[in-house]
């Protein structure tokens, strides 16, 4: 059976399920009004109606270019040319009297520009938003981080983890149920190499490894770099790696026991590191358990039964189980095995490839193998949540564990270099389970993180003049070249602490440290999230440590400013409740919005109230940068508001109530957006 690799296939076809939300945003409500008007006027059902937000409020709050599409439809139906502007005029008349709309204009060749009733919109935006209803109707499994448990995690791993964690937060913000998985490749080459290092370079026994009292993942970082040099000195030593891999896959013996200890201890270090930036996990599935619990064997048999794979009997892949590509698939035959047209699932030496094990794991994710792991607690977080780890030992199974797997969809955060094998993983899963769950699943690809030349030199690496002229230099674990996450956080916290101590000497040491930590996390997470997933990041210490401009601390400071406003108002005995605004008539609110500075005030309200639209756009595109950009925009808008309007000294009670309401909305939405980004604003900065 030939499996077609469709290079034009969209991994993002799943977001259709989010387009019928019960809790409608302002854009969706207005879109429905327009859709109903089109049905009444022209008896046409339009499934998709595009809506735009004009760049300036004087041009309207929403713009609908739908008249152009209607003109085409009507011409096709009647054979007569239709004027889009005339169609737009009829639509404008139809929706002009709808509640919530203040004015409708026709602009240009046929745009319908809608101006909202600002007073009505503001009063509806002041109360807390209602809970969001989930749309998918099942659990989404998000797999992220998945750092090889062989050494300390670096900044490139953190981009994966922060993207994944933010995706989880995005999905939960629109009401979805999410299970967070961190797949542990404890039988791969990287773990095997560290085992070789301990056994054949340091010549340590398991007890001696257990006795290492320095930071264990850092020790392994240095050792891993030594192993690369160890192989370079004598290529025959690579046989040690091959032998070790076989022993790891066997799942027993001294070498396996040593590798199991190393991988679990390093994994514990990774969880501690990720917790520093607010990242937690539900379950830690281990690759060794995929192999030893017959999960791979069950999947292997299904793949053979469905004709998805076949045994190659000739050529250089003879003896391998491969997934055949379609004849028309355009792949260079000279490429390495990882990217050749016929994807190897089991090598001729019997070793299952990463792709093969991944297919099995994803079939389990969707509940297609009628088999499960055993589970035991591995790490308990301070909030009581437990990170469970898989095991093959039924005696270790804790029956209190939640039900894992059996998802309605899965999303994998894996770097863009794995796009080709990930395509085959999905094709393998589709060969067994070709339904909506697979269609809704996606590979969240992202570009890697490189280092600026200045950063490399700060790490103590010598560069040639040619390297110094380059914009970015790739990290290399085998060379020990990279920025460890813990080191980076330490530097960020130290820098932030200096500023906090200078500005707030009255705070206790504990409060200063907590504030510095929140600022450091805000700076780091925002730096990694403000770039779109397909943008390569050239990591630079100076830029990451900056607190001005488009940075996390800049946005955090906006919340701090809003909080300070409410503290001062409370100290002055001024009412800041929603009831204060309710005492102001809609007519008076409309006057204030129509008066001097009214457009600026409205633009802040309107931008703040569009958070839900922004979240839905981010979920539909699986792009956290959309939220990051929105947060920065509203922080800019609010800081301008803060400088231009002085609430405490405002003599007009109605105007003051309006300014308080706007501050409350902006603060609430900023805090909500930062929470989705995994950032918390400190009380003071």
Where are these regions (language model features)?
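Non-catalytic interaction-recognition regions
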Residues: 5, 9-122, 134-685
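Flexible, low-complexity linker/hinge segments
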Residues: 127-135
């Amino acid at each position: 059976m030939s499996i077609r690799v469709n290079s034009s296939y969209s991994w993002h076809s799943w977001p259709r399920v989010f387009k019928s939300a019960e809790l409608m945003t302002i854009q969706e409500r207005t879109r429905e009004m327009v859709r109903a008007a089109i049905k009444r006027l022209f008896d046409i059902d339009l499934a998709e109606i595009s809506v735009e937000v004009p760049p300036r409020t004087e041009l309207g709050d929403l713009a609908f270019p739908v008249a152009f599409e209607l003109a085409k439809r009507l011409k096709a139906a009647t054979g007569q040319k239709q004027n889009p502007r005339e169609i737009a005029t009829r639509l404008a008349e139809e929706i002009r009297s709808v509640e919530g709309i203040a004015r409708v204009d026709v602009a240009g060749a046929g745009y319908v520009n809608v101006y909202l009733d600002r007073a009505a919109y503001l009063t509806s935006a002041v109360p807390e938003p209602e809970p969001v209803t989930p749309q998918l109707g099942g659990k989404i499994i998000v797999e992220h981080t998945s750092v090889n448990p062989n050494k300390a995690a670096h900044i490139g791993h953190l981009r994966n983890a922060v993207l994944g964690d933010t995706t989880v937060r995005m999905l939960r913000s629109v009401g979805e149920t999410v299970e967070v998985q961190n797949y542990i490749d404890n039988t791969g080459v990287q773990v095997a190499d560290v085992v070789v290092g301990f056994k054949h370079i340091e010549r340590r026994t398991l007890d001696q490894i257990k006795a290492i009292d320095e930071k264990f993942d850092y020790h392994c970082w240095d050792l891993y770099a030594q192993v690369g040099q160890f192989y370079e000195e004598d290529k025959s030593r690579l046989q040690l790696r091959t032998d070790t891999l076989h022993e790891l896959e066997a799942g027993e013996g001294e070498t396996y026991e040593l590798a199991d200890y190393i991988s679990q201890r390093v994994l514990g270090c990774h969880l501690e590191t990720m917790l520093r930036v607010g990242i937690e996990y539900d379950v830690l599935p281990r690759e060794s358990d995929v192999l030893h619990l017959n999960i791979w064997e069950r999947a292997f048999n299904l793949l053979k039964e469905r004709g998805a794979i076949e045994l190659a009997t000739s050529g250089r892949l003879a003896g391998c189980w491969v997934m055949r590509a379609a004849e028309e698939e355009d792949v260079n035959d000279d490429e390495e095995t990882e990217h050749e047209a016929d994807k190897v699932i089991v090598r001729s030496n019997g070793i299952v490839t990463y792709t093969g094990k991944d297919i099995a794991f994803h079939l389990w994710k969707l509940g297609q193998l009628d088999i499960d792991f055993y589970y035991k607690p591995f790490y308990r977080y301070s909030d009581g949540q437990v990170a469970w780890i898989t095991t093959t030992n039924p005696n270790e199974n804790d029956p209190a564990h939640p039900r894992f797997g059996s998802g309605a969809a899965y999303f994998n955060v894996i770097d863009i270099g794995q796009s080709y094998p990930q395509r085959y993983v999905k094709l393998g899963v589709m060969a067994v389970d070709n339904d909506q769950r697979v269609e809704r699943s996606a590979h969240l690809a992202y570009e890697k993180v490189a280092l600026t030349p200045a950063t490399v030199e700060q790490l103590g690496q010598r560069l040639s003049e040619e390297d110094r002229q380059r914009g970015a230099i790739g990290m290399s674990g085998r060379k020990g070249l990279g920025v460890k996450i813990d080191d980076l956080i330490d530097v960020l916290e130290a820098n932030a602490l200096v500023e906090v101590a200078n500005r707030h000497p009255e705070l206790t040491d504990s409060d200063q440290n907590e504030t510095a930590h929140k600022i450091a996390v805000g700076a780091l997470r925002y730096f990694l999230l403000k770039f779109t997933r397909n943008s390569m990041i050239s990591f630079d210490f100076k830029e990451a440590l900056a607190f001005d401009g488009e940075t996390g601390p800049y946005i955090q400071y906006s919340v701090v400013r809003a909080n300070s406003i409410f503290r001062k108002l409370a100290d002055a005995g001024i009412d800041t409740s929603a009831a204060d605004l309710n005492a102001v008539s809609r007519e008076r609110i409309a006057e204030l919005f129509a008066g001097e500075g009214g457009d600026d005030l409205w633009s802040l309200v309107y931008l703040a109230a569009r958070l839900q639209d922004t979240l839905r756009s981010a979920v539909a595109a699986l792009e956290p940068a959309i939220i990051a950009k929105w947060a920065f925009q509203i922080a800019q808008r609010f800081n301008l508001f803060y400088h231009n309007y002085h609430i405490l000294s405002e003599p007009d009670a109605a105007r003051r109530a309006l300014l308080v309401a706007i501050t409350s909305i902006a603060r609430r939405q900023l805090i909500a957006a930062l929470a989705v980004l995994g950032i918390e604003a400190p009380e003071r900065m």
